[in-house]
Each structure stands twice: as C-alpha cells, then as structure tokens.
Amino acid sequence: MSAKNTTVPVSTRFTREGMQVLFMAIFVLLAAIMREVNLLIILAGTLLAILLIQWRVCAKTLIGLSTYRRLPRSMHSRKGFEVELVITNPKKWLGAWLVLAQDRIKYVSADVASEQISQGIGMLYSSIAPRSTCIQRYCCTTQRHGEYQFLGTELTTRFPFGLLRGIMPHNGGDTFIVQPAIGKLTPLWLELFGIRTSNARLRQTRSLSDEGDFFGLRAYRPGDSPRWIHWRSSARRDELVIKQFQQADSRELIVLLDLFPSSSLDQQHRDSHQKHEELAIEFVATLASHIASSNFGVITVAIADAEPTITGRIQSRSQSSGLLDRLALAHCGEEDKIQSALSLLEREFRRVENLMVVSTRPQVAFQSQHNENTAIIFWRSMTWLDASAGDLTKYFAPAE
C-alpha cells in the first residue's frame, strides 16, 4: 500500500500533568507579581520554559514522519493475519522518540447498519533514528469476509516531559479485501463430480496421466503416487517434484451461487439468512480453492447476487485468487438475479451436463418463481444444495 506524505500540521494538547504544571506556573507568577518576589518570577519563568520546550520538541518530533502499511497477499476471515506498519523518519538530524501509532479498521458494507469499526490498535515506537525506518506488526482477525477500510493512522508523542501531547493524523481511505474462510471438504464432495465415494481413495492415488497429457512439474504433495516422481528434476532442485498432467474436460464442475434476497423484516430471520449466505459463499470458496490447489479439475462459478458475474475455468491458484476476491464482495441485492446468472452460463457453455446450484433457498421456491416453459433450460441435470436446509454439511465443514 502506498505511503502517505505527511504534510498535515501537528497539533498539541495539554496532558493532565501539563495542565497541573501550567496552573502552578500561573499561580507562582501571580504570587510573584503580587509579592514582588524575584525568586518566584524565576521559578514561574522556568516552568513556562519547560512547557515551551515540550511544545517545540513535540511538534518537531512528528513533523515529516510518514507511514506505510504492508499486507499479506491473501487474507481470510476467522484467520489471523499480520499487518506491518512502517514509519519513516526523513529528517537529517532530529530523531523521533516514544511515538505511539494508533490504527483503526472499518468493515465496509452496502448496509450502513452493518458497518463495524474496530477498537484502536496502538503500537509504541521507542526510537526512530534520522533517515531510517521502524517496523511494528500487529495481528488482525476479522469475523466476516468482505471489504475493509483503514480509517487512518494517528501518530502521537509526549516526549520528553509528558506535559503536552503532539498529534499528527494521517488520512485513511486505503481498503483491502478479506476473502471467505476456507473450510474442509469431506470425502463425499467427490460425488459432485459424479465420482462414487467408494472409489475416492482410488481416484486420489491414480496416475494423473490417465486424465490427460503431461505439461509440467510441481512440488510433491502427501498422497501423490511415487510412480510419477521426476527423479532427475528432484535431484537438481534438491526436493521432490512430480509430473503434472492436463486434466480432462470431463472433470469440469459448473457452480451457480444463488444469493436469494430475504423478504422478511424480522431481524432474527435476517441474521439467520445472512449466516446461510456466508455459509454458501464459504463452501464455494473452499471448493474452488481445493480444486485449484490440488490440480483435480476445472471449476466455473457464476454468482447471482446484486451484480451477477461469471468466472470461468479456474484451475490454478492465481486464477482462484480473483474468484475469492469476488466471492468476498458477493451479497444479495434487492431483486432475484438468478435468471441473469443463468443467461451468463448459457452464453458461455450452451449446453451443460450437470449444473450445481448452491443456494440460500429451497429448490421448490426456485421452481415456483420460474416457469420451466419460459426459463432458460440448457442443463441436462441439476444438483441443488440448499444452505438453509443443511445440505452443505454432507460435503463441507466450515472453518472455526
């Protein structure tokens, strides 16, 4: 994330101790004037000089400091990730001491009532030398996937006497996306490809060459067949690598994520519907992530939410990253958009053997609202998984 150029002026405020010293200085000064005692005038001047030094040091310490954040490539909900906050001191001679940086994060939602602001995260930088940088890290865990925004970093210092607090705010606005949590698939998930559970272990250990042509190498993973270890490349790389084969088109899974809007005004029902929606999104994200990382097949996902989209033929981690970002931002709109998503799939494939629909409503509700005589029918069979009815528990265990 880009650094912020700190041209914001530094403001100073009295601390409790500073107010006490200021009160003492005024009291001593008034007493010295009334009594005409020179020693009291000197004492009052000394106290005021200390406050003046404190004010100048606070202001000069923070001027010129810039902040910079580093985030991981991918972040998932309910899984902690580290945020690096880097402070750079470009000044030639003056360092910075006892700088407290406070960060805050806000969950950005289409529903204003759902927006949440985190507690302030404080990090103390004991010393930042001239022309140097200092790094602090903090761990962040989000309970929901979606878009988040930094509200800005506030740098403060009370150095050297703690009588005044220098404050320099840094404008926020930087956003980042937290991808859905990745759960675990049960062995029964292979049924979605038309593979019987009894043959699951056999299919996992079979040679990948039965499914296509050799096209590259990849790192060895537990469960891979030793028959396909490429020994020459393994010796050269000093690690086990195996041959990788192009998957057959028959192992393509076409998924439609149906985020049906809730029409109920009851808050408890809406909260329950939101949980089912998040469960459906996490299941599709886990499915796509597993297929892309295991080189098992190809997956195409169409999302029927407020803005229907389609992401086709995901078969690598780099491709699945974009899909996970899109799933993180998926949310139901005010209207049913499943017909628009079906149109996107129909234009992409023309004909589909098996269409898997992951929905937040029962199939009966879909059939009652869409007349089969007028709706687009381009699939030979349909597998309907209703998250609200617990259909996903057979194939999926959510992340804790």
Predicted feature locations:
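Secondary-structure junction/capping motif
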Residues: 9-15, 275, 336-340, 391
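A generic hydrophobic-helix recognition signal that picks specific residues
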Residues: 28-29, 251, 353
